[in-house]
Amino acid sequence: MKEGIHPNYREVLFHDVSNDFKFVTRSTIQTKDTIEHEGKTYPLAKIEVSSESHPFYTGTQKIMDTAGRVEKFRQKFGSKLGAAKK
């Protein structure tokens, strides 16, 4: 194997910000933030959805539109979709 071409594979703490769930797994993600968890310092990756908050895994319906994507879609295509149904 060549030296210096492979990404750094290390333990990273992922933080699901929607429900404050944290878990440690190995990843090559590049982050600037760090956090202390159970006496160790880990690189921190903030995520919006994990298995603890996704409706498929939790069995609950929840609107997860944090960026306003649905409203943008309705503004852009709302009148066109209504005319196409007639």
Curated annotation (Swiss-Prot):
Example GO molecular function: structural constituent of ribosome
InterPro entries named among the record's database cross-references: Ribosomal_bL28/bL31-like_sf (IPR034704), Ribosomal_bL31 (IPR002150), Ribosomal_bL31_B (IPR027493), Ribosomal_bL31_sf (IPR042105)
Record's GO cellular component terms: ribonucleoprotein complex; ribosome
Residues forming coiled coils: none
PROSITE patterns, alphabetized: RIBOSOMAL_L31
Subunit structure: Part of the 50S ribosomal subunit.
Similarity annotation: Belongs to the bacterial ribosomal protein bL31 family. Type B subfamily.
Protein name according to UniProt: Large ribosomal subunit protein bL31B
Species lineage: Bacteria, Pseudomonadati, Pseudomonadota, Betaproteobacteria, Burkholderiales
The gene coding this protein: rpmE2
